[in-house]
Curated annotation (Swiss-Prot):
Entry annotated with the keyword Membrane: no
Lineage: Eukaryota, Viridiplantae, Streptophyta, Embryophyta, Tracheophyta
UniProt EC number: 2.3.1.64
Gene: ACT
Keyword Transferase annotated: yes
Transmembrane segments: none
Name the record gives this protein: Agmatine coumaroyltransferase
Phenotype upon loss of function: Increased susceptibility to A.brassicicola infection.
Length: 452
């Protein structure tokens, strides 16, 4: 897809502050220090006349820039940098007077309907819609944005964000707040404004243990954990033929999966939530689609929200990351490749979700620590990005809700995405990105149990 960069703007908060802002990373922030940035894109379809170049540059873009400046007053951290100076024991988020957020403005002549669709599309065609986020060994930006015009068709907003500054809930609040401000010209009343990391109460010593784990998360630099440099990502080139697809799973199909779990399990009182059965179905289809050695190690994870699980609970207005990985690593592929693979996964996830009510941060951390330290080369990994509680379609900037959203970072981070459906009638929406051969097998297996 041909892309022309029109300009790169530096957007500053509407209300300037001369005081520096320095926020040390919390235990939860540190866990995501070595994860490659989260990338999302929101597609907005417009009429031919409202998406002309004249209208876009005279009306739409100025409104987006003006509202972004207003909302950055309350999301000032997004204009700052991640820093790790040699004298500091851990990294900090630092915002200085005059710091700004990078906003790239671009155009493309690509077919908007196809690019923003839900069907199979080449991964490479969508990559240009995501802005770069420069990260070096001792410093890095935390958020960058890109607005791309499809003349006479629509536009999209691409975001790239470092996970240390936000999780799914914080990202959702920012997107909604920016959209609300653009549409109505007013700032929402409730915003995540608490930056004080002391409200995150975790057992003493966990932060240091997390820092000691960092070298294990950077495969090319085991001896040096003191770097912000990210591990290498999976390269995507044309010959790999990596495809992505968005699948909407209806409430009826969710019920099919729940009934299947009840029928195949000998255990009573399973926690059969939409999240559990969807994750179990995707995971088992992924393992089978990979085929290969049945004795290969596998590892799957989801992020649990600990805001209400700490004592005392974290304020609802907390600005930052407050999720911890629930890790499942003591398994081989063969345990999920057979007909009982689905129910095996359901039981594992069900037990995990039920334990969350009583399981503390420290015991959850110990499992993740062991899984990370013992992870072997060639392990098949899958992480769910998001959940069926995260809604990405309530972001109306004044030109209607997005017709589609994509989490673009799922391929390189060994993830699949999960969120609420756009139509709001229940069920769930998932995003998958795989090489064509695996994708063909995955879809065949996926639809076998729930229908098209």
């Amino acid at each position: 897809m041909a892309l022309k960069v029109i300009k790169i703007s530096r957007v500053s908060p509407a209300t300037a502050s001369v005081d520096p802002l320095i926020v040390p990373l919390s235990f939860f922030d540190l866990q995501w220090l070595k994860l490659n940035p989260t990338e999302q894109v929101f597609f907005y379809k417009l009429t031919e006349s409202s998406s002309s170049r004249d209208v876009f540059y005279s009306s739409i873009l100025p409104k987006l820039e003006r509202s972004l400046s207003l909302i950055l007053t309350h999301f000032r951290l997004f204009t700052g940098h991640l820093k790790w100076d040699s004298q500091d024991p851990k990294p900090h988020l630092v915002v200085l007077s005059g710091d700004t957020l990078s906003l790239t403005v671009a155009e493309t002549d690509a077919d908007f309907s196809r690019i923003s669709g839900r069907g199979l599309r080449p991964e490479l065609e969508l990559r240009p819609l995501i802005p770069e986020l420069p990260i070096y060994s001792d410093s890095g930006a935390v958020v960058s944005l890109q607005v791309t015009l499809f003349p006479k068709q629509g536009f999209c907003i691409g975001t790239t964000a470092h996970h240390v500054v936000l999780d799914g809930k914080t990202a959702e609040k920012f997107n909604k707040a920016w959209a609300h401000t653009c549409k109505h010209g007013t700032i929402p009343k409730i915003l995540p404004t608490v930056l004080d990391r002391s409200v995150v109460n975790v057992p003493a010593g966990l932060e240091q243990k997390m820092l000691e784990l960092l070298p294990y998360l950077t495969e090319d630099d085991k001896e040096n954990g003191r770097t912000l440099k990210l591990p290498p990502v999976k390269e995507i080139n044309a010959k790999d033929n990596v495809l992505r697809i968005t699948i909407e799973i209806s409430p009826e199909n969710i019920e099919k999966l729940k009934e299947r779990a009840k029928k195949e399990s000998t255990r009573a009182e399973l926690h059969l939530s939409t999240f559990v059965v969807t994750f179990a179905h995707v995971w088992t289809c992924m393992v089978k689609a990979r085929s290969g050695d049945p004795n290969r190690p596998v590892r799957f994870m989801y992020a649990a929200d600990f805001r209400n699980r700490l004592e005392p609970p974290v304020p609802v207005t907390y600005f930052g990351t407050c999720v911890l990985a629930m890790d499942f690593y003591k398994y081989k592929a063969k345990e999920f490749m057979g007909e009982d693979g689905f129910v095996n996964t359901v039981e594992i996830l069900s037990d995990s979700v039920k334990r969350l009510a009583s399981q503390g941060v420290e015991s959850t951390w110990k499992v993740y620590e062991e899984g990370t330290k013992t992870m072997k080369w060639g392990t098949q990994l899958l992480v769910v990005n998001g959940s069926n509680q995260i809604g990405m379609y309530e972001t109306d900037f004044g030109w209607g809700r997005p017709i589609h959203t994509e989490t673009m970072s799922i391929y390189k981070n060994d993830e699949f995405s999960m969120s609420k459906r756009r139509d709001g009638i229940g069920g769930v929406e998932i995003g998958i990105s795989l090489k064509k051969l695996e994708m063909d097998t995955f879809l065949s297996l996926f639809y076998k149990w729930i229908g098209n």
